[in-house]
């Protein structure tokens, strides 16, 4: 197998070694040098933090007001009972929240199998020990189970009026169905190349998801998150909106509005001066060079402009305005 310097090897062999229902070892090879750690670390983080799962987030126990209470007939402290509830491996089918009940009379051991389940809820580890009751012991409690991702401390959970009620004990929730993930990178060889990686991922779940399915879901999440880069296109910067510069309305009026003498008006039109804005930009020297326009006409023009707070030789940076089309001038000229 010959590859040029710019081509990448892609894995062509994947082996899944299932130890039991909850533990599996997945081997992927060959990978380019360094890609074993790149993919291994990314998949490990996703497996531990991003797969959805169900967990108990709240418990109500008859006769118990807070987690530091003791319950007569229960050998364990309430804190120990709550800690044991975190070990429940629960599967919810087609729902995001459910309430479960447990009503147990002593003596005897309390296990997850004592929890009453609706038809759409399964407990994968019914043998889990929750506590022990003496002869006169009686435990009755109600559990709130929800779907989530990652780890959610109880003190960061949003509360409403009901969840703040006395007797509702909040639990830190670990929703991840993956209990443990470890990966290692070994050397791999393909023909003459010995600088390749072999990625080995070993993981353990709580039984609510198959280890192979967990890997598949983690890879799908990773693919979805980075797929946006495949079609990455730089957004075109929007063109700045040019603010329309205000022009003195007087400058947009035709020179005829100045009511000059016929002689002066005709001289200006001969020099293609149609608007007052055209006129004020001319200097006295320029106007005196106009045929048939003498000092008397110049004085007349200066006096009329002065009456409108204007003068000759003005500098107008925004003249002519964009909306003053060339054809406007020609139409004016033909009048």
From Swiss-Prot:
One of its GO terms (molecular function) is protein dimerization activity. It holds the Pfam family RNA_pol_L. Homodimer. The RNAP catalytic core consists of 2 alpha, 1 beta, 1 beta' and 1 omega subunit. When a sigma factor is associated with the core the holoenzyme is formed, which can initiate transcription. It is an enzyme of class 2 (transferase). This is DNA-directed RNA polymerase subunit alpha. InterPro entries: DNA-dir_RNA_pol_insert, DNA-dir_RNA_pol_RpoA/D/Rpb3, DNA-dir_RpoA, RBP11-like, RNAP_asu_C, RNApol_insert_sf. One of its GO terms (cellular component) is DNA-directed RNA polymerase complex. Residues 1-233 are annotated as: Alpha N-terminal domain (alpha-NTD). The gene is rpoA.
């Amino acid at each position: 197998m010959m590859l040029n310097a710019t081509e990448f090897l892609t894995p062509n062999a994947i082996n899944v070694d299932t130890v039991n229902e909850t533990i599996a070892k997945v081997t992927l090879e060959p990978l380019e040098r360094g890609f074993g750690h790149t993919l291994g670390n990314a998949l490990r983080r996703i497996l531990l933090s991003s797969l959805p799962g169900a967990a108990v987030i709240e418990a109500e126990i008859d006769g118990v007001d807070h987690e530091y209470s003791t319950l007569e007939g229960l050998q364990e402290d309430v804190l120990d009972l709550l800690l044991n509830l975190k070990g429940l491996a629960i599967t919810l089918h087609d729902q995001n929240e459910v309430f479960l009940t447990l009503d147990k009379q002593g003596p005897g051991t309390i296990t997850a199998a004592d929890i009453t389940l609706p038809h759409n809820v399964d407990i994968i580890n019914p043998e889990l020990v929750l506590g022990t009751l003496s002869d006169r012991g009686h435990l009755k409690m109600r559990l709130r189970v929800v779907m989530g991702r990652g780890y959610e401390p109880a003190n960061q959970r949003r509360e409403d009026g009901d969840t703040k009620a006395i007797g509702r004990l909040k639990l830190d929730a670990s929703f991840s169905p993956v209990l443990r993930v470890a990966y290692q990178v070994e050397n791999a060889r393909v023909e003459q190349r010995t600088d390749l990686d072999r990625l080995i991922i070993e993981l353990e779940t709580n039984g609510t998801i198959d280890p192979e399915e967990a890997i598949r879901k983690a890879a799908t999440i990773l693919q979805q998150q980075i797929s946006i880069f495949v079609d990455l296109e730089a957004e075109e910067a929007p063109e700045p909106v040019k603010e329309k510069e205000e022009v003195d309305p007087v400058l947009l009026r035709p020179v005829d509005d100045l009511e000059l003498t016929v002689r002066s008006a005709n001289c200006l039109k001969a020099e293609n001066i149609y608007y007052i804005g055209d006129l004020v930009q001319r200097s006295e020297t320029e106007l005196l060079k106009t045929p048939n326009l003498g000092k008397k006409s110049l004085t007349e023009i200066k006096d009329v402009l002065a009456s409108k707070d204007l003068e000759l030789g003005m500098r107008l940076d925004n003249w002519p305005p964009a909306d003053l089309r060339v054809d406007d001038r020609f139409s004016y000229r033909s009048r």
